[in-house]
Design a protein with these regions (language model features):
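Glycine-rich NAD(P) Rossmann-fold beta1-alpha1 loop
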Residues: 10-16
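A short beta-strand-loop structural module common to alpha/beta enzyme folds
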Residues: 28-39
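FMN-binding flavodoxin-like domain, especially the glycine-rich phosphate-binding loop
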Residues: 3, 14, 25, 29, ...
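Short, hydrophobic/glycine-enriched beta-strand segments
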Residues: 4-9
Length: 163
């Protein structure tokens, strides 16, 4: 499958770094959700990857929070969306990658087909609303506690997205 772009919001650079790895693996463009043309680019795309980090007790990253009302107005009918989220399973074990679920709910409600769910194997958290039917709704990453697993998780996930 060809991907039209990876859209991300990043505050500390971790999500941007991961988004770059994913974009390179999928041979597609990288777009900061905070840029003025991001919403238009999403509207004009068919197959997109969306990423966010989770802050505090399950909050969206600031750039996503800023554009969420516009994002919620996008018609995702006919679009394929894959999600990735960053979180801290030791510091916030009860809200691990919860922000990914907020985006998942919006795109699903607005008609997207969501792909790229992943297994819970190898993670150590207490709770996450980003778990649906026993799987994460996308790729869950922990750059704080499991950075050594990030590249292999991205490779496996992107391989599945490409097939």
């Amino acid at each position: 499958m060809n991907w039209d772009g990876v859209f991300f919001g990043s505050s500390t650079g971790n999500t941007e770094e991961v988004a770059e790895l994913i974009a390179n693996s999928l041979n597609t463009d990288l777009h900061d959700i905070g840029s003025p043309d991001a919403i238009k680019l999403i509207k004009d795309s068919n197959n997109i990857v969306i990423g966010t980090s989770t802050w505090g007790d399950g909050d969206l990253q600031d750039d996503w929070d800023d554009i969420m009302s516009e994002f919620q107005d996008i018609d995702f009918s006919g679009k394929i969306v894959a999600l990735f989220g960053l979180g801290d399973q030791e510091g916030y074990p009860e809200t691990f990658v919860d922000a990914m679920r907020e985006i998942y709910d919006v795109v699903l409600e607005r008609g997207a087909k969501v792909v790229g769910e992943t297994s819970l194997d190898g993670y150590d958290f207490e709770e996450s609303i980003a778990v649906v039917d026993g799987k994460f709704v996308g790729l869950a990453l922990d750059q704080d506690n499991q950075e050594d697993l990030t590249e292999s998780r991205i490779e496996a996930w992107c391989s599945n997205l490409s097939s």
